[in-house]
């Protein structure tokens, strides 16, 4: 892309959603976000980000200016706050002072995002602009941001989950039976900090399913074990951000910012950071009710035991879960999801609806609607095997 109404553009990011910096004689500098020609989902992201323009502040975000088309591509024009994408500054560990000079305003910018009532849902270095001259940090990439305080991510094939898997919180994968909220952004912030401090991501994997497994079940190597000169308290801050459950993480970006400022003060004053209690100023202004299931340990244990028996001995088992509407049957059953999908299993579900009593197979159809996408995005040899088995079962039923 070379010109747009007198602008000359240089590339900052390639991909389905590309980012360009535009400048020209006498023209106001801009950023241009362009969607791929055959990327309907990407177009929707640009439209969504533009719709948020009144809620994004120039103090912490690159604000949308216009939504237009250029050479057959949907483009979003942003104000250019200056700065360099943070992913261009990665690749080697950062010293403590340099890290804190980036991390503190970054946590502060995220604090403003959350105070505005938004969840970014795609925090990563490529969506962060860092101005080395002023120290300012601004976010881009609000294409999947949510105005909801808390929302559920449905289980989807890894290739279609909105966001970036390398930076994605466990609950955002849709496989934890937990909601996405502002603390999901804090996990992604922790991944970004980890990469800044060590020069590497906390998890790498050969395929998306394995990467999801890492986020859900594996503990990363603490940063101070990879960078021996790193003060332990900084490493502990990052590890707290990377906790598997929301309740164990920092609850607010303000709490992270306060602890980082304490680290900077100690580092500049004494050249070291002694251990201190984390999160002393980490108080949320919202009541976040924990999503842990209480009083259902027996029912969950029964389901897990049935699953274990089938895995060990083969065959099939039927477990019926009954109860009044709204009592929590789905929540109990969904606790199996993580256990099944981590070893590359397939989890599908259907729910009986009183309004569909005249459609006896609607629940099975609902379950199979979840099965087909998982097969298409799974191992290629699964498809003919499942097809053959399904044909045999259908033939048996038809003969009855």
Positions of PLM-derived features:
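C-terminal lobe helix-coil module of Hanks-type protein kinase domains
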Residues: 164-269, 322
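Protein kinase catalytic-loop region centered on the HRD/HxD motif
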Residues: 108-118
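AlphaC helix of the eukaryotic protein kinase fold
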Residues: 40-55
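Activation segment signature within eukaryotic-like protein kinase domains
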Residues: 102-103
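Conserved HxN/HPN-centered segment at the entrance to the catalytic loop
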Residues: 57-66
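Conserved short submotifs of the Hanks-type protein kinase catalytic core
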Residues: 71-85
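Key residue(s) within conserved catalytic/signature motifs
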Residues: 59, 210, 229-231, 235-236, ...
């Amino acid at each position: 892309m070379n010109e747009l109404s007198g602008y000359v553009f240089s590339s900052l990011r390639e991909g389905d959603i590309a980012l360009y910096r535009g400048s020209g004689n006498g023209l106001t500098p801009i950023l241009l976000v362009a969607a791929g020609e055959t990327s309907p989902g990407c177009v929707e992201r640009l439209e969504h980000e533009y719709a948020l323009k009144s809620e994004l502040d120039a103090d912490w975000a690159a604000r949308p200016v216009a939504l237009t088309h250029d050479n057959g591509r949907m483009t979003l024009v942003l104000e250019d706050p200056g700065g360099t994408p943070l992913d261009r500054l990665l690749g080697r560990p950062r010293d403590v002072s340099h890290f804190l000079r980036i991390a503190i305003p970054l946590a502060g910018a995220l604090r403003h995002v959350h105070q505005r009532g938004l969840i970014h849902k795609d925090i990563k270095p490529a969506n962060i602009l860092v101005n080395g001259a002023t120290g300012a940090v601004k976010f881009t990439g609000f294409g999947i941001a949510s105005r909801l305080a808390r929302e559920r991510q449905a289980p989807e094939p890894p290739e279609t989950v909105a966001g970036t898997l390398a930076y994605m919180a466990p609950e955002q994968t849709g496989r934890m039976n937990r909601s996405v909220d502002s603390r999901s952004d804090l996990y992604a912030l922790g991944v970004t900090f980890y990469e800044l401090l060590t020069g590497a991501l906390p998890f790498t994997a050969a395929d998306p399913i394995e990467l999801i497994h890492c986020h859900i079940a594996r503990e990363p190597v603490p940063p101070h074990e990879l960078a021996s000169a790193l003060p332990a308290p900084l490493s502990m801050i990052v590890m707290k951000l990377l906790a598997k459950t929301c309740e164990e993480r920092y609850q607010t970006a303000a709490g992270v910012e306060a602890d980082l400022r304490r680290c900077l003060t100690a580092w500049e004053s004494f050249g070291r950071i002694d251990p201190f209690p984390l999160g002393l100023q980490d108080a949320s202004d919202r009541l976040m009710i924990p999503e842990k299931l209480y009083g259902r340990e027996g029912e969950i244990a029964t389901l897990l035991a049935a699953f274990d028996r089938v895995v060990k001995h083969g065959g099939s088992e039927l477990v019926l879960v009954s109860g009044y509407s709204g009592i929590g049957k789905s929540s109990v059953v969904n606790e199996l999801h993580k256990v099944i999908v981590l070893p590359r299993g397939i989890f599908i579900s259907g729910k009986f609806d009183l309004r569909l009593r005249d459609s006896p197979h609607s629940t099975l159809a609902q379950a199979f609607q979840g099965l087909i996408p998982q097969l298409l995005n799974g191992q290629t040899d699964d498809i003919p095997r499942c097809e053959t088995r399904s044909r045999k079962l259908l033939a048996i039923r038809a003969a009855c």
